[in-house]
Amino acid sequence: MEKVVIVDAVRTPMGRSKGGAFRQVRAEDLSAHLMRSLLSRNAALDAREIDDIYWGCVQQTLEQGFNVARNAALLAEIPMNVPATTVNRLCGSSMQALHDAARTIMVGDADVCLIGGVEHMGHVPMNHGVDFHPGLSRTIAKAAGMMGLTAEMLGRMHNISREMQDQFAARSHQRAHHATQSGAFRHEIIPTAGHDADGALQRFDYDEVIRPDTTVDSLAALKPAFDPVNGTVTAGSSSALSDGAAAMLIMSESRAASLGLPVRARIRAMAVVGCDPSIMGYGPVPATKLALKRAGLSLSDIGLFELNEAFAAQTLPCIKDLGLLEQIDEKVNLNGGAIALGHPLGCSGARISTTLINLMESRDVQFGVATMCIGLGQGIATVFERV
């Protein structure tokens, strides 16, 4: 079976969804920009040799509809012989795109793939056109489709206090701000055209949604967002609404060697699992354990973890049950997470994987895990190995 390697991994800045930098930039353009950038950064690859493009996106309608992957590829002027498909596993869509492409390479049906994902939550809100089947209430809790309430449930089950959530949320912003100030994000962000507050066109090379002035005290003043009477989850301890895209160039190890392209990481193992929709945020725990079992590794072998921070009340139980609470500041989300950067749904899997690979390089770590919860009760995880 072919070994699959990551040759390059990039992302756009994360733009604020409400009146932010990308308010006049379409999802296809964010995607096409990254596709072009990956090809220009890896000039040894002839674009005609790309076997397929896998692109994650959740709300596949309006500008994100009609196979946004193919639309973006055509905008990027990738040769027309290169096919493209759009993938949807809700929050895990672009990580699923990575898994789908990797398996294609593993079995020899492809050598080179572009993968990634996009979500413009300012143009296509996450609840746009959603119409759950009324019969679902006979098999799952009605609130299982309300992500904030599932976070409340998970937090209560694991005794996650409001103060713990606020501390974790403040940490996310502080670490993301430090990563910005220290230049750590420069290795993954591709400067992207957008508009400033006055409408002037400019290139953005920083994440717009980070709030450097966030403190535990300022978060403590916020009201519960989903359960106004007994809730602990607030807007401040939830992932921000943002617009963005992320992308990776992956190929067989043998093709990377023949092209003379540097290998940044190898995919060691992958997993996806289901769990109770009422606690959908717990999915990273069984997904990580299954991926590690397939990799022949243990939790102690992993030097870095990236967990998508859908909610602090959701992330902390996962960190606890993975035995990482005592190592959180050495191993978990060292550059912050979605609470600070936002969670553009279809983008996030490739985004956290890109951040993880950059951290693995900067800290000389051999093994890393990127893992995410998924709405309606799923989890997805990828084990990366530096080579």
UniProtKB/Swiss-Prot annotation:
The keyword Flavoprotein does not apply. It catalyses: an acyl-CoA + acetyl-CoA = a 3-oxoacyl-CoA + CoA. It comes from the Bacteria. The active site is at C91, H343, C373. One of its GO terms (biological process) is phenylacetate catabolic process. Belongs to the thiolase-like superfamily. Thiolase family. This is 3-ketoacyl-CoA thiolase. Heterotetramer of two alpha chains (FadB) and two beta chains (FadA). It comes from Pectobacterium carotovorum subsp. carotovorum (strain PC1). Pfam families: Thiolase_C, Thiolase_N. InterPro entries: FadA, Thiolase, Thiolase-like, Thiolase-like_sf_Thiolase, Thiolase_acyl_enz_int_AS, Thiolase_AS, Thiolase_C, Thiolase_CS.
